[in-house]
Each structure stands twice: as structure tokens, then as C-alpha cells.
Amino acid sequence: MRVWLASLFLCALVANSEGGSELEASDESNCGCQNGGVCVSYKYFSSIRRCSCPKKFKGEHCEIDTSKTCYHGNGQSYRGKANTDTKGRPCLAWNSPAVLQQTYNAHRSDALSLGLGKHNYCRNPDNQRRPWCYVQIGLKQFVQECMVQDCSLSKKPSSTVDQQGFQCGQKALRPRFKIVGGEFTVVENQPWFAAIYLKNKGGSPPSFKCGGSLISPCWVASATHCFVNQPKKEEYVVYLGQSKRNSYNPGEMKFEVEQLILHEDFSDETLAFHNDIALLKIRTSTGQCAQPSRTIQTICLPPRFGDAPFGSDCEITGFGQESATDYFYPKDLKMSVVKIISHEQCKQPHYYGSEINYKMLCAADPEWKTDSCSGDSGGPLICNIDGRPTLSGIVSWGSGCAEKNKPGVYTRVSYFLNWIQSHIGEENGLAF
């Protein structure tokens, strides 16, 4: 009872002090107030000091800026309240037991200067690309970039290109246009690669369906033949930043398909697929489009009717089978190099004859040892045009895999630029 009365008396004194009886402490260093906060003590308890924060700031030291909804630069000075990663998963508090085992936590001697404290707000204490936090995934804690916007992107874009901070065709790793044959790779080599999965019932993991390419922050280009038998957008989920299929990849983003557009003149009545192009509009569960990162980037579109010269080396990427006799798709992303073949050669009778038209591109390994195969459908054919990686083709069809005189056939993207723009619109972030 005495304890309760004492507590009540203390609360009354504190309440009274809030009404105007607070006194400024003579030594503000004892509080460590930031952002214009004033160190104050109570009239009857002068040894108890705290920070009185200006409007818009809160926290023990007024270190949290409640008005900040975006970050500047790389966000090292960000002190806002974003507290989820790019997939909407909650951040761990910097003073939580799990985080205390990590390098950056609230118990560091420099925690206050780094923005760390008794909260779970996103920070960038180690000068990374953007604000991040620790997220619990299974039994482990992972560093995850946060769902918070770059302030420079909140301004109205000056053009239709690069409106989300992307730089099309830019890789985190050095370009690899000289490899011979296929090899397993990481998505940093093809950061525009999109993995499209078909949802399964009963809670089982989704099944890999096709590849695609991120052509703007909200749009993925793929092949119509991937979806004609199951055209409902709700049946698909799209991942960016995946190096391993059906596995968690740090930095990956998951999207629902908001809109699925199949080409109205698609035809598969013969061996060939005609007008084999599709567009998927993607959004996260929180309504976000793709965010640029080391593993996620857009790919440049080609000039109108501008294609790589015949004989050019181009890259193909996917989770497709390594041969026509394989039953399972590989777990790791694979990249190969093929050469563009002329229409005249590809239309030869011992190639594909009259099945080839001007809306298609042919490409193959001169040794016929590597090729796109089942499971690579919809994925990118990336060629160097005017010094930058460009989406020249979309994996469409072919006879077998790496068969002699049977090159892979790709949708010629430069022919379909008007179709793409007519469906996406002008303010789209496309880069040509």
C-alpha cells in the first residue's frame, strides 16, 4: 500500500511538472539530447533528468524523427520510423536478445550516434546502399533492406525513363560476354531476371513456370505461351533477385501479378510460336513495385528495329533443363552465351524453313553444345547494343535443346516496342 501511495505521489509530481514546473538542467550533457531537445529535471526530483523533445521528434534522446518518410543519399542519416523489410516482414528491435549477438545493436558504445536504440526502426550504421534492419527468418537473423523510399524518387520524374532510380542494364558484377558454354551463375550477373512460379494448392511450394525480364519497376516481359493454358493472373507469383530456385535468396522480392497481358495475335498452330510476348504487372503485398538493388535491376529495351548484328555474342539465362532428356529443372540459375544467326541461315530448309519470320530472332552456340531449353521459356536474350546490355529477345521455341542446325528461336523485342508501350503507357520507367 505504501509503495502504491508513493508511486501515486510521484506521478502527481511528474504530472504537475508537465504543467509548467519543469526546470532546465544546468548540465545538458547528462541527457545527450539531439535535434534541439532540452534536458530538463523535475522541481522536486532534480536528479531525474530527461529530454524534452521538439514537435516531430521522440525517443529517449529525441533521436527519432517521426516526420521522415524517406531517406537521403544512402540513408546513413535516416532516423525515421520505417520498420519492415521490402517484403513487409517486421524488423527486430536493436536491443532484442537476438540482435545483441549481431555486430550492430543498441548496446554498442556508439549506438546513439548510429541511430540504434530501444526500437526496431531501419537504420544504416555501416554505410550500406540504403537503410536496413535485422529480420528473423526461421532460426536465423538476416540483414534485409527496408521498405522506405529514396527521397529523390518522391519527386516528379523529369522524363519517362528511370523514374524509380533504376539504371537499366547495370550489373553489380563485371559483364561476362566472353564465357564459352553454359555455367551456373548468380543473379547479380542478370539482375533483371524474373522467376515466374505457378501457385500450388494445399500450401505446397509453388512450381517454377517460366522466366521473364524486368523492363520497368512494375512490369516484367515474358512469353505468352507460358500462360495460355492457365491465363488467370491470380495463379502466379513472381520473384526478383533469385539465384536459387525455391530457396530463400537474400535481397529477393516477391510479387503478386496485378495484370497479365497476353498478345492478342499469339498462335501456336504450327511448330513455331507467333507473337510470343506477354507482360506482367507486378506488386508486392504492400503495393510496391520493384526496388533497385545489387540483385534487382531493369534491362534496357532495344532501339526500334535495332538488333545486334549477326554473329554477336548474347547471353541467355534461366532455370531450364540442361538437355531435352532431363526431367528436373536445376536448382541454380544458369547462364550461357549464344551467337545471333541471320534470318537467311535460320530459314534454310535444314534449319526451320518457312516457320521463321521477321518477328523472330535465331541464336545458337556454334558448337551446338549449349542452348535455351525447356524451363527457359520467357527468359531474356541479352545482347550488347550501343555498349549496354539490351533485351533483344525472349526465349520462345525451338526443336530439342542444342540440336545441330536447330537454334533457339526468340521473340524479336524491337518489333514489339509499340505493343509494349500501348499496354504499359508513357509514364512507365522504360529505358530504350
UniProtKB/Swiss-Prot annotation:
It is found in: Secreted. Transmembrane segments: none annotated. It catalyses: Specific cleavage of Arg-|-Val bond in plasminogen to form plasmin. Found in high and low molecular mass forms. Each consists of two chains, A and B. The high molecular mass form contains a long chain A which is cleaved to yield a short chain A. Forms heterodimer with SERPINA5. Binds LRP1B; binding is followed by internalization and degradation. Interacts with MRC2. Interacts with PLAUR. In complex with SERPINE1, interacts with PLAUR/uPAR. Interacts with SORL1 and LRP1, either alone or in complex with SERPINE1; these interactions are abolished in the presence of LRPAP1/RAP. The ternary complex composed of PLAUR-PLAU-PAI1 also interacts with SORLA. The lineage of its organism: Eukaryota, Metazoa, Chordata, Craniata, Vertebrata. Residues 27-63 form the EGF-like domain. This is Urokinase-type plasminogen activator. Keywords: Disulfide bond, EGF-like domain, Hydrolase, Kringle, Phosphoprotein, Plasminogen activation, Protease, Secreted, Serine protease, Signal, Zymogen. Residues 34-57 are annotated as: Binds urokinase plasminogen activator surface receptor.
